[in-house]
Amino acid sequence: MPYIPLMQLQQLRYFTAVADTRHFTRAAEREHVAQPSLSQQIRSLERELGAELFHRARGHITLTDAGETLLPLARRILADAETARREVQDVAQLRRGRLRLGAPPSLCASLVPDVLSAFHATYPGVDLIVTENGSQDLVRALADGALDLALIITPLPVQAPALATSELLREELVVVSAPDRPAPVTGRRTRIHVEDLRGRPLAMFRRGYDLREFTTAACRTAGFEPTFTVEGGEMDAVLGFVRAGLGIAVVPSMVAERSGLRITPFATPGMHRVVSVAHRGDVSPSRAARELERILKEHLGLGPSAAPRPRPGPPRGPRGAVAGDRDRP
């Protein structure tokens, strides 16, 4: 293997300083170093390269042919090193960079926009890339390195040992229906039971999405299969189907409160889901990911070691209360 000189950036800085000033003492003053130290570094560089870089005549310093060859290369190396330092610092200090977040559609329609708005206000130079998908797909994307951070529903049906998770909140699920259609409960009842969903047309997400799996599991536990009349891949689509009277839907309370639809809570003990933030356990998250997680927990009123916060459901009130008739959060 050929010998490769181990030039140092400091040596190249000293070399360009002498080339600029044509004087060792003035070069040392410019670099804030003792003149003997600068001269020693130049001699060391010349030994590494196997060529003299300067003609040294008393009071007259000029570049040799080797020095003339090295000078533009040294300037380019120093400029590239400065660019690398600056760009890495920009990323490290979040002046620029990229953050890839994954979340289920229901959270993208409620929690995520507010949190990303707060993050962007603090770090406007960081590009935000959001992927909507079910928790299982998001976990796979984390494992493949396609995401930096994900909001998922836990516990997962299949263990993911390489995943580090932190619970954020326990959110209530409710039933939404069109305000101009009959309420899903009758008489004096203000709350719905899972059994009341038997035979009712449901608007729901397609297979693989958390809310569909959650609703299906609850119905099967109650002894029946849910009836899905229409399926969608986006929260806005499902809410639109409900608004058009195509069915009712089970959605998180955070989504329901913004929907303008009639909200009917489940009877005690209710239906809930746990939202957690996750990243790969074998890789340290980037500073951008750590900052987003901090802002997320701050938004939810959680400290570094706080337990997941229950998400309050719709307030008790008369049957058929419509979310749009209440103060928005």
What are these regions (language model features)?
Residues E48-L49, L70-A92, V115:
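Alpha-helical linker/hinge and terminal dimerization helices associated
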Residues N133-L147, I153, G208-T264, P318-G324, ...:
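Hydrophobic hinge/microswitch elements
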Residues E46-L63, E68:
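A short LG(V/I)-centered, amphipathic sequence patch enriched
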Residues V18-S37, H60:
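Short helix-boundary/capping micro-motifs
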Residues T264-R309:
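A late-sequence structural motif
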